[in-house]
Design a protein with these regions (language model features):
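Short juxta-domain linker segments that transition from a proline/glycine-rich
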Residues: 1-183
Length: 183
């Protein structure tokens, strides 16, 4: 049987919380509450520890922001959940443009995907959506987020919606994910 120090070392190496090693049965984490984008929009049935820890970190940030907004009696954001999945693509695009107050050809003034992404990120942030971006879990540079597992995810909330973008993606990928998650 491994010693406590060996288990502690294994916990650090794998990124698995130490207490998990002492459970009778492995815990099952529910990730069904969140939708996230993968490459080729594949469904992911067993999210990695890196994804689950990132989700948890973003939930904590969202909860803190929501509590601050509730304390200041901020209104709910009217556009969150305002459009149904059954709407036609053209109607949907119009809704997004109106929400962001941008023209059909907004991207023509941008030099490249990076500039387009930054502009759109600012528009979305100005509406009250928290847009977070990282390529690692927390501050751990050894725990790199895999774009094959997920490119982005959204945590829907009427007061504090949050979009997380995997910064290891290309700028065009980030741009698409940002628009997709805003929707």
């Amino acid at each position: 049987a491994p010693t406590y120090n060996q288990i502690e070392k294994m916990s650090k190496v794998t990124g698995i919380p130490l207490g998990y090693f002492f459970l009778e049965k492995p815990s099952v984490e529910d990730s069904s509450f969140v939708e996230y984008r993968t490459v080729d929009s594949k469904e992911l049935s067993n999210p990695s520890r890196n994804l689950m820890d990132t989700l948890h970190d973003m939930e904590l940030i969202q909860e803190w922001i929501r509590n601050e907004l509730q304390a200041t009696e901020s209104d709910d954001l009217s556009f969150v959940g305002a459009i149904k999945k059954t709407v036609q693509n053209n109607d949907f695009a119009t809704f997004v443009r109106r929400s962001l107050q941008i023209e059909i050809n907004w991207y023509e003034s941008c030099k490249n995907g990076e500039e387009s992404f930054k502009l759109l990120r600012n528009y979305i942030s100005d509406l009250g959506v928290v847009v977070m971006m990282s390529g690692i879990v927390g501050n751990n540079t050894h725990r790199i987020l895999d774009t094959n597992e997920f490119r982005a995810f959204a945590l829907v909330d009427k007061k504090a919606p949050l979009i997380f973008i995997n910064s290891n993606d290309s700028f065009n990928g980030k741009l698409f994910s940002l628009l997709h998650e805003f929707a």
